[in-house]
């Protein structure tokens, strides 16, 4: 009949699949967190550096999977948006179109960029911090020879104190932008409260000039958390 528009292809099933794919990112992040924990365990117990290097390779593999997943999701979203604009009446070969778009995106990949993944960068920082602590312990004077092997060289009490609560941290998170550390619950509450008032959030560390904090900037400070746990373990023995 004239004046009656033809039905447009529905992409609701594609939207559902996209939602499932995005949920997979959480599984990748869990795998990365486990890898970080294993690597720090290996360092703490004095395992060979080759075993720690193997964990670094695992982290790079996770980084590659995360990159590929994000690019595939982007390819699907771009393709679907294009088809929606064209209001197609017949079901296209969506899989072929997505694969073509995905292949185009992947041509620009450089595996060196995997080392810039936020979680991989944080992983390297945590290994560096743990190695620094272990190295300081090994170079200590003879007075420490009989100290329990679980004791690590610990940072000063000031470095364990949250700049917001002024109490020793139990669940520290680090700001990726400025590198300062806070108690997770305290800093997240502070950011949320300020954002609700439409105000920018300045890093609470005295002297820090970073003035636009976001919750997405915060990552677990696993190395410091392990140090705090060791300290508390030692306190419990006395």
From Swiss-Prot:
Chain intervals annotated as zinc finger (SP-RING-type): 147-233
InterPro entries the UniProt entry points to: Nse2(Mms21), Znf_MIZ, Znf_RING/FYVE/PHD
Subcellular location: Nucleus; Chromosome, Telomere
Record-annotated disulphide pairs: none
Pathway: Protein modification; protein sumoylation
PANTHER family per the UniProt record, alphabetical: E3 SUMO-PROTEIN LIGASE NSE2
Protein name: E3 SUMO-protein ligase NSE2
Species of the source: Xenopus laevis (African clawed frog)
């Amino acid at each position: 009949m004239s004046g009656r528009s033809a039905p447009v292809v529905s992409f609701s099933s594609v939207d559902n699949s996209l939602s499932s794919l995005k949920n997979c990112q959480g599984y990748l992040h869990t795998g990365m967190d486990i890898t970080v924990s294993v690597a720090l365990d290996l360092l703490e117990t004095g395992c060979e550096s080759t075993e720690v290097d193997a964990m670094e390779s695992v982290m790079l593999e996770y980084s590659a999977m995360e990159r590929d997943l994000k690019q595939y999701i982007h390819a699907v979203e771009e393709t679907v948006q294009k088809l929606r604009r064209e209001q197609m009446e017949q079901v296209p070969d969506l899989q072929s179109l997505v694969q073509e778009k995905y292949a185009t995106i992947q041509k620009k990949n450089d595996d060196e960029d995997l080392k810039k993944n936020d979680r991989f960068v944080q992983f390297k920082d945590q290994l560096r911090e743990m190695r620094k602590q272990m190295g300081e312990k090994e170079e200590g004077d003879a007075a420490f020879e009989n100290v329990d092997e679980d004791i690590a060289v610990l940072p000063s009490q000031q470095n364990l104190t949250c700049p917001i609560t002024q109490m020793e941290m139990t669940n520290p998170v680090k700001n990726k932008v400025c590198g300062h550390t806070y108690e997770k619950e305290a800093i997240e509450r502070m950011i949320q409260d300020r954002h609700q008032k439409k105000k920018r959030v300045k890093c609470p560390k005295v002297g820090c000039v970073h003035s636009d904090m976001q919750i997405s900037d915060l990552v677990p400070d696993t190395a410091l958390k392990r140090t705090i746990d060791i300290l508390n373990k030692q306190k419990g023995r006395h």
